[in-house]
């Protein structure tokens, strides 16, 4: 029997989907670091599965930009230059501002409750230093807000941009001080949402994003 955890979904996950979820967890938890080689054989042995579903999962992560394939060498966790991060974060700024403005009038009480819950889960995970859980809650928080805009094509692009920097986000959240700072930023974002203040919301999202980029810039280009 496979040692991969089974997803709690209405339809049974395929082995490839289970492998993909496991690899995503390794990326966001920092078990797989930028530049690290990922071999099909090692992954297959560690999860107790055959190579075929591992190969399929690795291809998905390559398409998302989280892995790169080098001929005759295999797969590696993507390494980004600071210029790459700056481009990605600028694209996020433009797309997320658009969705934030569209989403704000559509946010109902039920959605706001879910978003607040995600922020609380993010903070609690940060306090216990569970980076993988914190990153998952962080996504639910941000995407829960933006998805209210009902712009699926823009949302798909935003998800791809987030995916491409996930290993670096894990590095950012490894800092206790930055985890606390992020929790405070989420509270300010929620306050702007509660006030239905679009300009304030955009400003808080920009500040939150800019802080993450500044930390990553320092990591990639130390003084």
Where are these regions (language model features)?
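C-terminal all-alpha effector/ligand-binding and dimerization domain
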Residues: 11, 116-123, 163, 170-223
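Positions in alpha-helical segments
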Residues: 75, 83-86, 101, 120, ...
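Hydrophobic packing residues in well-ordered alpha-helices of helical domains and bundles
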Residues: 88, 115, 134, 138, ...
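Amphipathic alpha-helical dimerization/coiled-coil segments
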Residues: 95-124, 128-131
